[in-house]
């Protein structure tokens, strides 16, 4: 599923102009004494909608007036992505905001956080607890390791986002700093902090990350992806 590509200025405007909502689910006992507005969905004794629209209804409950409120945000500007029609594997617990592009056969594991404007290429895996900041881009058939961070750039609007190429492996807990580009076929070692652009087909490691060798057959074998993990 491809979202419309947004510039930093467009994302800032999107967030700034969005209606801020505190979406809740409320289960109540008794009866509502006032009509339910169109902005609120009522299914039996359950209400879905913005707290500002639901709170007045609860003040007019008849009988025992008991209710339970479930919420996960406050004055949120960006909803979560509708994942129903993605041709990808998204595991429970992944947090993916709206205006994110996820291409075919990508995998997003539990605990991953994908911010607005990020792009994930076909066949790419985002592992457990990895973070893709705003506008971060990952190419095709890459792997972003558990706990890795691709720093986001929404402000300042003039800054460039992180761009990871095709067939790249970013190791666990590595950090790629704002504006850095990692070339196709390269490997970022676990725990590395990448502060400068990385050319194609090299291995970088350390803090700050430096080139330690070119990709060879042994490295390719160690970093090969498993297609079966991307089957749907």
UniProtKB/Swiss-Prot annotation:
Keywords: Acyltransferase, Amino-acid biosynthesis, Diaminopimelate biosynthesis, Lysine biosynthesis, Repeat, Transferase. Belongs to the transferase hexapeptide repeat family. DapH subfamily. One of its GO terms (biological process) is diaminopimelate biosynthetic process. This is 2,3,4,5-tetrahydropyridine-2,6-dicarboxylate N-acetyltransferase. Signal peptide: none annotated. Transmembrane segments: none annotated. It is an enzyme of class 2 (transferase). It catalyses: (S)-2,3,4,5-tetrahydrodipicolinate + acetyl-CoA + H2O = L-2-acetamido-6-oxoheptanedioate + CoA. Catalyzes the transfer of an acetyl group from acetyl-CoA to tetrahydrodipicolinate. HAMAP family: DapH. InterPro entries: DapH, DapH_N, Hexapep, Hexapep_transf_CS, Trans_hexapeptide_repeat, Trimer_LpxA-like_sf. GO terms for molecular function: tetrahydrodipicolinate N-acetyltransferase activity. Its EC number is 2.3.1.89. Pathway: Amino-acid biosynthesis; L-lysine biosynthesis via DAP pathway; LL-2,6-diaminopimelate from (S)-tetrahydrodipicolinate (acetylase route): step 1/3. The gene is dapH. It comes from the Bacteria. The lineage of its organism: Bacteria, Bacillati, Bacillota, Bacilli, Lactobacillales.
């Amino acid at each position: 599923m491809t979202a419309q590509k947004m510039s930093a200025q467009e994302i800032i405007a999107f967030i700034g102009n969005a209606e801020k909502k505190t979406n809740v689910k409320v289960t109540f006992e008794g009866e509502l004494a006032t009509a339910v507005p169109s902005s609120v969905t009522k299914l039996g004794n359950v209400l879905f909608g913005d707290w500002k629209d639901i709170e007045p209804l609860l003040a007019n409950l008849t009988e025992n007036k008991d209710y339970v409120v479930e919420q996960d945000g406050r004055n949120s500007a960006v909803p979560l992505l509708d994942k129903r029609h993605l041709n990808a594997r998204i595991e429970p617990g992944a947090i993916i905001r709206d205006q994110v592009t996820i291409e075919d056969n990508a995998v997003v594991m539990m605990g991953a956080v994908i911010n607005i404007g990020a792009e994930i290429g076909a066949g790419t895996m985002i592992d457990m607890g990895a973070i893709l900041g705003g506008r971060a881009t990952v190419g095709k058939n890459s792997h972003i390791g558990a706990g890795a961070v691709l720093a986001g750039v929404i402000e300042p609007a003039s800054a460039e986002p992180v761009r990871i190429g095709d067939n790249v492996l970013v190791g666990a807990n590595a950090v790629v700093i704002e504006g850095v580009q990692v070339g196709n076929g390269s490997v970022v070692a676990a725990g590395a902090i990448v502060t400068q652009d990385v050319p194609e087909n090299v291995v970088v490691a350390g803090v700050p990350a430096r080139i330690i060798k070119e990709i060879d057959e042994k490295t390719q074998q160690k970093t090969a992806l498993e297609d079966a993990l991307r089957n749907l």
